[in-house]
Amino acid sequence: MHELHTQRRVEFADTDMARIVHFSRFFDFMEAAEHEFLRTALGDGRQVHFEYEGHEIGWPRGRVSCEYKSPARLGDLLDIRVSVARKGTKSITYRFDFSLDGQAVAHGEITAICCRVGGPKLEAIAIPPFLADRIEEAPAATAR
């Protein structure tokens, strides 16, 4: 799996006083879409944070960014395309393309690092095979 399409309705709580989406909300939208991507890739009822070899696994962020192209407003139904821009042994970089009626709204990226999170400090680990085998990088034309 290298891509997922989903949608998100802009709610009142997502907007600022001008009734456009507050810039910070796009990071919430990206995280929700990432979680949907991972749940779909896992396909077995597991949640994004799961146990593997006796340890809790989580996905802290190494890098996030978002570039805004045009405003989204209260009530808009955003189309969100999530694609895997890069899959390393210990991290995944997702690309998020937001659009409204075919017009670009924003583009973002998240690099999530696979880590053991239950102990006193985070430890980056290889993405477990049962997940790594289900995720692949998007073709170059798709990931941009």
Segments predicted by a language model, with ranges:
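Terminal targeting signals and extreme-terminal segments of soluble enzymes
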Residues: 1-77, 85-144
